């Protein structure tokens, strides 16, 4: 079976140029997101903003992204996927310029809400449903999980390199504002990759609303569970995790970036392992039995007696927690019909983004009120609950290749 024999290849055999371009664009965006996820909270912290204010700003970015994602899913039938990707690139460029020029907190809130800034180590932007549906359309069913694994691998590995590059402005004697301008410039590079995409990434029924139909109950159920998982993740998005490490163990920006880089490398490697594992035990079992131990490791983090133990738990979590990402994305695209894919991708992504947005604000308040890492304990507990509910509710709902 291919997934068990050739999972190690950089790309599945026979993938199209469209898939390669989408993976490259994801890597480019993830690289600059990785830099921003480290620099944004520390920059705001040095500017005198409290953890609660920083959490509010991160919440604004996630709520804005969620609403944009919902709009993309609702109105995507009005234009081609390439045209929507072009609009997303314009929004990304404007976001970078806005953060580079703004200094007032209220202005930053507006830019965060309307823009594409990503405080998470994963992708929560309006690019996500567009790229997911394009990948599902361009990939053969038997290659779908492997393609999504490479998509996640490209994003996580590039994001890890981005976190490692976060101290670069300080080394070069540049203000952090230069990184925000670089973020905006990367939007031009992303559009250069999206522009040559072929008609194969488009849904044939452009101009027809892709509403949910026979798969409505499945998508609603998955959206609710994904929201619970993302609510837990919101308590320790990478920006807040970086701030917790930076403050709790009194380490430098370079050390913080290095820790999160190696965590990203561990996550990236796990995506490839997820492919043969899913081929053996199924998508849902892979999602649950790798994610649950990682949730327990998060709950153990507040009790880490020193930096070494904390780093060990973080790396162990990273090696397990994201195996559910390519399998989850593949599962959603598999259990709905092709015309429903844009709406399904948008609804699940919106549920995740809105739920994630709640966490940073509460976590910021908790970090202000107490020195104990309550956000990690609560967030890990919510994610463990999600794992058990997902197994109970969807273990019998099989994708076509498992039936």
Give the predicted meaning of each segment.
Residues 162, 166, 184-204, 386-394:
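C-terminal membrane-cytosol helix-exit motif in multi-pass small-molecule transporters
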Residues 12-63, 218-226, 230-260:
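Helix-loop boundary and gating motifs at the non-cytosolic
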Residues 83-98, 285-300, 380:
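Structural signature of the two symmetry-related core transmembrane helices
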Residues 68-80, 170, 270-283, 367-368:
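Helix-to-loop junctions at the C-terminal end of transmembrane segments
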Residues 41-46, 159-179, 243, 247-248, ...:
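Transmembrane alpha-helix termini and helix-breaking/packing motifs in multi-pass membrane transporters
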Residues 146-167, 351-359:
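Glycine-rich segments within core transmembrane alpha-helices of 12-TM secondary carriers
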Residues 27, 95, 105-126, 309-323:
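Hydrophobic core of transmembrane alpha-helices in multi-pass small-molecule transporters
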Residues 67-103:
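Conserved MFS/SLC helix-loop-helix module at the cytosolic interface between two early adjacent transmembrane helices
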């Amino acid at each position: 079976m291919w997934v068990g024999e050739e999972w190690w290849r950089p790309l599945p055999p026979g993938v199209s140029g469209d898939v390669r371009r989408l993976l490259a664009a994801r890597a480019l965006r993830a690289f600059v997101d990785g830099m921003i996820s480290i620099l944004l909270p520390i920059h705001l912290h040095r500017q005198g903003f409290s953890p609660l204010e920083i959490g509010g700003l991160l919440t604004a970015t996630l709520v804005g992204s969620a609403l944009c994602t919902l709009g993309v899913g609702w109105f995507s039938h009005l234009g081609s996927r390439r045209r929507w990707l072009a609009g997303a690139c314009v929004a990304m460029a404007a976001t970078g310029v806005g953060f580079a020029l703004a200094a007032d907190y209220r202005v930053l809130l507006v830019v965060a809400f309307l823009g594409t800034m990503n405080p998470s180590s994963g992708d929560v932007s309006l690019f996500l449903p567009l790229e997911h549906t394009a990948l599902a359309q361009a990939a053969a069913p038997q290659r779908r999980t492997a393609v999504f694994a490479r998509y996640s691998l490209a994003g996580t590995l590039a994001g890890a390199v981005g976190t490692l590059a976060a101290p670069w402005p300080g080394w070069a004697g540049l203000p952090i504002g230069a990184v925000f301008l670089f973020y905006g410039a990367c939007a031009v590079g992303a559009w250069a990759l999206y522009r040559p995409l072929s008609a194969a990434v488009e849904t044939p029924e452009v101009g027809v609303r892709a509403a949910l139909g026979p798969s409505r109950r499945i998508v609603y159920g998955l959206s609710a569970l994904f929201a619970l998982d993302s609510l837990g993740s919101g308590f320790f998005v990478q920006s807040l995790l970086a701030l917790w490490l930076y403050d709790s163990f009194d380490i430098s920006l370079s050390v913080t970036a290095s820790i999160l880089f190696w965590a990203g490398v561990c996550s990236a490697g796990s995506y490839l392992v997820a492919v043969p594992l899913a081929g053996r035990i199924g998508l849902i079992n892979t999602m649950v039995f790798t994610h649950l131990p990682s949730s327990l490791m998060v709950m153990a983090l507040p009790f880490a007696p020193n930096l070494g133990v904390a780093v060990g738990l973080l790396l162990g979590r990273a090696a397990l927690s994201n195996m559910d990402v390519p399998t989850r994305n593949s599962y959603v695209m598999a259990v709905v019909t092709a015309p429903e894919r844009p709406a399904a991708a948008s609804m699940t992504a919106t549920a995740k983004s809105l739920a994630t947005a709640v966490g940073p604000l509460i976590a910021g308040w908790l970090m202000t009120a107490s020195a104990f890492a309550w956000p990690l304990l609560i967030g890990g507990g919510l994610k463990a609950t999600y794992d058990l509910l997902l197994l109970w509710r969807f273990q019998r709902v099989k994708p076509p290749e498992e039936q």
